[in-house]
């Protein structure tokens, strides 16, 4: 997977990817109060299409990705835009978690790439502060798009991993959106439960 995304890094900022990142960014802005107080983890943040606009509003953003080339693009854009409150880490958090916890984790079109959903959700829980939130943007599973998620299943899985206040919405749907087929992009928001 690392090699695949290194290869895509220089062409990743296509009009479609920019459009989808902007959609997710606007949804995050609507969902989260007082972004200026928040320390955010962008998991699998790639070229920074979501992290950089969020950093302009948030207290800080940590962009973590396993692709060195994607991170190079992010760093370059942050320098060009003079964004200082962002750090970049080439790290697999499933193998080497951070000691730091965050108010908010954003995961945009990354979760369907993760081979172990359970381990990934547990890792998100570990990296969130008490009452912290995870925002997952990804594709709805359909007959033609088996890489996505059935929302009820994802919501149930989040509940199993001690998340509550779980809410999902469809942000956008279009032909050719994912792998050449009709697809719908959803946003699911969940809060780390106090019980865990």
Show which residues each predicted segment covers.
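Conserved class I S-adenosyl-L-methionine
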Residues: 1-35, 38-44
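Class I SAM-dependent methyltransferase SAM/SAH-binding core
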Residues: 47-95
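A conserved beta-strand element that flanks and buttresses the S-adenosyl-L-methionine
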Residues: 106
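A short glycine-rich, Lys/Arg-flanked "PGG" loop and its adjoining helix->strand segment in the class I
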Residues: 119-130
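Conserved beta-strand signature within the Rossmann-like core of class I S-adenosyl-L-methionine
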Residues: 132-139
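Short alpha-helix
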Residues: 147-162
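Core SAM-dependent methyltransferase catalytic element
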Residues: 174-196
